A protein has these predicted regions:
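Extended, non-globular alpha-helical segments
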Residues: 55-89, 149-150, 154-165, 175
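C-terminal lobe/tail of nucleotide-utilizing enzymes
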Residues: 48-77, 184, 242-262
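Non-catalytic accessory regions
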Residues: 1-57
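Helical mechanochemical/support elements of P-loop NTPase systems and associated helical scaffolds
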Residues: 6, 17, 21, 32, ...
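Walker A/P-loop phosphate-binding motif and the immediately C-terminal alpha-helix
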Residues: 62-140, 225
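Conserved catalytic-core segment of NTP-binding enzymes
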Residues: 182-262
Length: 262
């Protein structure tokens, strides 16, 4: 359903931008993210898990069924985040999902987005920054032994990242809850911390969460990130909290790709 002239345009754009065919087509507006993802899956462009595979929670639907409506929504979010990060190196983006009192829905979104990134962009690292209430380890059924907390405290001999059952996706769990580790998160840009991990060709997605009554300095924490998507919960997230976070991100020139109301 693409004309030969369009295919030529896509190939030229992909070559110039260093992008795969599907992403180049999305950038040019010739394919929407939903169609591109389904085509890629049908072509065997990325492996899927069989229904009932116990290695990943079924809530991470993108790992099982790219045609699912939720998976399509997640691909659209990915496309918006990549568009917001258009001035960055598309091969190794630093993205974040930021939950403002949004509950489990935000963690589920982050897990699905990481899967879609691994499927469409290649090697991806998902990092659980919610040290006080980790959740991504349960969704990917990875033991939360050593993780970000140990990495920040300098007690990890090796980078504490675990391979998930999803091809190309690694998970750095939150690690064991520690007040000192939690305070370290707020003291410096995570982008600078991640730069020291040596994963120059790996895209990264960080999951962060703020709960009612907290005033986390997300602007300084996420300085240097390519794009952020905010997740709020209808009827739960206070408008004042959301406004404060948005203003803080704006002060640090952090690109906000959009917001999701769970």
């Amino acid at each position: 359903f693409l004309a030969e002239t369009d295919i030529g345009r896509i190939e030229a754009h992909g070559h110039a931008a260093g992008q795969p065919f599907q992403q180049a087509a999305i950038d040019l507006g010739l394919l929407d993210p939903e169609t591109a993802g389904i085509i890629l899956a049908m072509q065997g462009g990325f492996p899927l898990l069989a229904a009932g595979d116990q290695r990943v929670d079924p809530l991470v639907v993108s790992a099982f069924d790219p045609a699912d409506a939720y998976a399509a929504k997640v691909r659209t979010i990915r496309a918006k985040m990549r568009a917001a990060a258009k001035d960055s190196d598309g091969a190794a983006l630093r993205l974040a999902i930021l939950s403002i009192d949004a509950g489990d829905e935000a963690a589920i979104l982050a897990a699905n987005l990481a899967v879609v990134m691994a499927q469409m962009d290649g090697q991806t690292m998902l990092v659980d920054v919610d040290i006080d209430r980790p959740s991504l380890d349960r969704l990917f059924r990875v033991a939360n032994k050593a993780g970000l907390a140990e990495q920040l405290l300098g007690s990890a001999a090796l980078l504490p990242a675990a391979r998930t059952a999803v091809d190309g996706l690694w998970l750095m769990t939150a690690g064991r809850a520690s007040g000192s580790a939690s305070s370290l998160v707020t003291k410096g840009p995570l982008a600078d911390t991640a730069a020291g991990w040596g994963l120059h060709d790996t895209s990264m997605l960080f999951y962060l969460a703020q709960r009612r009554g907290e005033q986390t300095p997300f602007g300084s924490i996420l300085a240097g990130f390519d794009a952020v998507t905010i997740v709020a919960r209808r009827g739960e997230t206070a408008i004042a909290d959301m406004r404060r976070v948005i203003d803080d991100l704006d002060r640090h020139n952090i690109s906000i790709a959009g917001s999701v109301i769970a």
